[in-house]
Structures are given as C-alpha cells and as structure tokens.
Amino acid sequence: MPTVVNPPRDPNTLSNYNNWVSTHITANFDILFDQRKLAGSVIHQFRSTTHGESNHIILDTNHLDIGSVKVNGQPSEWEYLPRLEPYGTPLKIKLDQGVKLNEMIEVDISVKTTEKCTALQWLTPAQTSNKKHPYMFSQCQAIHARSIFPCQDTPDVKCTLDFNITSPLPVIASGLPVRGSSEAPKSDGKTLYKFHQKVPIPSYLFALASGDISEAPIGPRSVVATSPDKLGECQWELEADTEKFINAIEKIVYPYVWGEYNVLILPPSFPYGGMENPIFTFATPSIISKDRENIDVIAHELAHSWSGNLVTNASWEHFWLNEGWTTYLERRIVAAVHGEPYRHFSAIIGWKALTDSVEHFGPEHDFTKLITNLKGMDPDDAFSSIPYEKGFNFLFHLENLVGKSKFDLFIPHYFNKYKGKSLDSYEFKSTILDFFKDDSEASTALNELDWDSWFYAPGLPPKPDFDTSLVDVVYDLAKKWLSLPNSSFKPQPEDIRGLTANQVVVFLEQILVSERQLTPELSKLMGEIYGLAASQNIEVANLYFQVGLQAGDASVLEPTADLLGKIGRMKFVRPLYRKLAKFDRKRAVETFEKHRDFYHPICRAMVEKDLFGKKDE
C-alpha cells in the first residue's frame, strides 16, 4: 500500500510537522543583557505521526547559532538546508531509523540567538520609564519564534511548555509562575525563574520579558506587572474592570482555563498596542489613561484566551478565525459591561478602520479577502484591520442571520469542539452548518448564504445596520464647531459632559478629516473649554494636539513636544511628528533629536523616514 503523505496546510513553515508533532518543549535560557542574546537549550518531545516512514525531523530556524543536537541523549547528525526567504533556514536532524506511529523521541538542541533575531527587542535604561535598568521582551507572532529557538513554527501545532530562565532582573513568561521556585541569586547576581504552561499553545505564543518589573493584584486571579514607579497607576486603571470582563466572557463562552489572567504593561517606548501572550497579556502603557476608558485593549486580549489561544487558526491564511472571533467577543464583553449600544459604537469605529485598510491596499487586493493566499509570503505583510473587522462583520452577519439567541448556543459549542485544536475556515463552515442542521429556518439561511463571497471576495463586505445613537451626538457637535464663526453656537463645558473618551475621539476625528479647518483661536478655545490639552487619555490628547497643529495653534506646541518624549507607540508618534513638522519643522526636528534614544528602533526608523525621507535622497 503506497504511503499517503498529507502536505501541511500551513504554507509559512518549512518544518515537516506532517510527520512529527512537538508535544512538549523545555526552554532553558540565560538572558545575556550585555550581549543582547539568549543562550541555552531547548528540549522537544516529538511524537511520530507516521508508521516509521520518516527518518529525519525538519525544524524552522532563522539566524540562530546552533551548538549541538542530541536525540534520546545521543549526539545526532544535523545540517542546515538551503535558506528560503522569508522563512529562514530549515534545520534537518537525522535519525538512525523511523519511529513507530505515536512513539516519542526527545531532541535536545543547544542554541544561542544572534543580533539578527527578529523576535527580541532589547531596550536601554533610557528607553524605560524610571531609566534604571535594561529591559528585553519578545514578540513572536507571526513567524518570529524560529529566531529564538528551532521549532515547528506554525499555529497548526500546539505543545505544553516549561520555562527555566536565568536573569539578573525579574522575568515574565507565557506560563504560570512556579511560585516559590525562584532560587536565591547565584554568585553572578542572576536568579532562575520557572514557569509552566499546562495548556498546549502554538509557537507564536512563546513569550519572555525581563526588566525592572513589580507586581500588584488587580483581581482575584489577576496581577498587573510593570515598572515599580508606574505600579500604583496601572493597578488603579485595571482593578475595576478586569474581573468584570472575565466574568462577562465566561458567561458567553465557558470558564477561563489558564489559571491566572495577568497584564504586563511594557515600557513607554513599546511601539505597538498589545499581544495576547497566555497568562500574561503584553500591553502598551498608553492604555493607562487615568480614566479607565482605554482598556478595551484588555477586553480584546482577554478574549484571545478563548479565540486564538485555545481555538487557533491552522495557518495565517485563516487569521480571521483568531482576530475576527476575538473582536466579536471583545464587543460582546463591552455590551455585557456597558450596554448593547456600546457594541455598535465600537463596531462603527471598527468599520472606519476597515474602510481605511481597504483604501490602503486597494479594493481588489488579495489581502482584503477574508481568506488570503500566503504561499511564499511573509504573513506580517498581510497584517491589517481586515481579519479583525471583516471577520467581525462576518460573525455579526451570521448572528443576525440565525438570530442572537440561537447564535449564543453555537458559541460554546464551537469553542468546546476545537478546544486545544487548530482549524481552518472550511471546518468552521461545516461546524456551523452541522450545528444548525435540525433547525430548518437557520439551516436554510446558512445554506443559502453566499459563503464564497464572504471568504474570497476582495474589498468591503455589505455594511450592517448599526445603532448610531452614540455617534450621532458627536457628529452633531463636530458640525456645530465647523459652523463657527458663522453661527450662533456657543461652546460650553456641558457639550462633552457625559460623553465617553471614545466619543470625544470620534468628535476630534470628525474635526480632523473635515474640509473646513478651525482657526487657531477656535482650536485654543476648544482645548480650554473642554480641558482637552490636560487630558491624561493619550487617545484624546494626541488627537486634540493634531487638531491644534493642523489649525496652526501655537499653544499646543509645548504639550505636543512633551507628549512625544513620553510615549513611543507609533499610532500616536508618527502622525504627531508629521503634523508638527508641517507647522514648525525646526521644532519637530529638535524634539526628535532630543528623544531619539528613547524610541524603539522600528519607531525611530519610521519617524526618520517621515521627517527626512529616505537617507539617500
């Protein structure tokens, strides 16, 4: 009988994970701040998925320094296969013979990262908030784990993990801390930190951070971890809602399985929003707004504990199964805590992000499809709000199609069926069709649905009927401001009393995108009457400063320059520098030169491009 080899369904890995599956990884690493490297070993437990037909294991690697390889304790032959961009250099480990179906072997690889590692960021003390110690953190999604250690770097394989990490500074990892296991510091001032991840996770959720980190409780099963000088304000920001959010989603899906839900607030130079690493969400400090209004990021990352981390897209071509579901669940949490109109308000903001992304790529672009073709591509290149918002709109459409109460019964069924597994869009489709097969009304509606258009048509999907009650009031307020000075409108502090920070954000966005511009006097008046310049909420303050810069209002120059020295998230930094440069180029360049060492290298390079163009021009 001929051997049937199923080709792997993930095109972005070079591993032969169709022959072998890693079931457990022990990661032993020493964090070398002076060299900006990790050094140590990884031990994989591999299960054979063939009847002894494979006598070698191929793993993903990228810019790694491999020392030696042992199989079941014995030195093994290994070689690098030819490098293939953008996926790296496959590591081929030779076995003496094939292994029977479901039998295990142990592979121990000594490894050191290199300066070309794409997953690790090393911050100088100057880039942290109290500027005392260096800091490092990882970001493995989508295909960067392979630059830390050899692995099957695909979301289609999940394994349990043990972390044994040695560092001179406290360590966070994507496992439960083995409490009380930290040894006394060794003579070299380093401490061993241990973590265990009992729930199988894909490689992209492998996470490490180390720096001057302290913890404080924010709920019965949650802590926030951050720099000691920021601990109090982070605790206040998160302690009111974290457990409320967990309770809300547990009612929608089923109980939280990871033990603890913790949040690591990264240094202010962190250039991104957040990452759903299990047990410890990694988050931007810009969510700490002193008004508890920006923590929808936490609702999103928490929702990943079910969608993405427990039930996972089998490849990045089906990324909407992670992010569309997570955005859907995030908005269900918001509705449960704040009311249904807030879900629609969030979806309206999301629809704007979706139209922006479609405009960016072009309405016919492959990356605007729900299911993308990533053969030969780097999944990072396809990253946008499309899988989040087109995915959300698809699920919202399905909810409206079958009815909310019926869809609510499907949610826990789906998350139970694929718990601990990975799936693709076709399995999702067959699962929902099967679930409703005995309900003639829902079944007919689902079978008549144009699945192919939802899955494969580029561009925008049909726009749903959203409840616009929460945006109408701010659209109206923006119109009144834009009617000045030719109208009788007299702005009062009461205009925005009772509005959420996100409503104020939408109001300011309307002013920014309008053809009509405010005068410098009106911009200043807006800031004074509404207290916008003094807002601790960066989402609000940065947009108000953009409005002021666009209007030519000199009163925002000082606070803009001040903010640019405190936050490194590109979402805020890049537009502020662009607008500052248009108004006062000298001030923009001076501000950038003053703070350049504070910014993350990615952010620094992008702002340099924005301010000075390409270096060779």
Swiss-Prot record:
Name of the top EC class for this enzyme: hydrolase
Major subcellular location class: cytoplasm
SUPFAM superfamilies for this protein: ARM repeat, Leukotriene A4 hydrolase N-terminal domain, Metalloproteases ('zincins'), catalytic domain
GO BP annotations listed: cytoplasm to vacuole targeting by the NVT pathway; lipid metabolic process; peptide catabolic process; protein catabolic process; proteolysis
Cytoplasm as UniProt keyword: yes
Record: residues binding Zn(2+): H300, H304, E323
Residues reported to bind a peptide: Q139, C140, Q141, P271, Y272, G273, G274, M275, E276
Reaction catalyzed: an epoxide + H2O = an ethanediol
Task of the protein: Aminopeptidase that preferentially cleaves di- and tripeptides. Also has low epoxide hydrolase activity (in vitro). Can hydrolyze the epoxide leukotriene LTA(4) but it forms preferentially 5,6-dihydroxy-7,9,11,14-eicosatetraenoic acid rather than the cytokine leukotriene B(4) as the product compared to the homologous mammalian enzyme (in vitro).
Species in which this protein is naturally found: Neosartorya fischeri (strain ATCC 1020 / DSM 3700 / CBS 544.65 / FGSC A1164 / JCM 1740 / NRRL 181 / WB 181) (Aspergillus fischerianus)
Keyword DNA damage: no
Family, per entry: Belongs to the peptidase M1 family.
Cofactor field: Zn(2+)
GO CC annotation terms, alphabetical: cytosol; fungal-type vacuole lumen; multivesicular body; nucleus; NVT complex
Any GO molecular function: epoxide hydrolase activity
Residues at the catalytic site: E301, Y388
Entry's EC annotation: 3.4.11.-, 3.3.2.10
InterPro entries: Aminopeptidase_N-like_N, Aminopeptidase_N-like_N_sf, ARM-type_fold, LTA4H, LTA4H_cat, M1_LTA-4_hydro/amino_C_sf, M1_LTA4H, Peptidase_M1
Record localization: Cytoplasm; Nucleus
Cofactor-binding details, from the entry: Binds 1 zinc ion per subunit.
Protein name: Leucine aminopeptidase 2
Superkingdom assignment: Eukaryota
Gene3D superfamilies the record matches: 3.30.2010.30, Neutral Protease Domain 2, Peptidase M1, leukotriene A4 hydrolase/aminopeptidase C-terminal domain, tricorn interacting facor f3 domain
Keywords of the record: Cytoplasm, Hydrolase, Metal-binding, Metalloprotease, Nucleus, Protease, Zinc
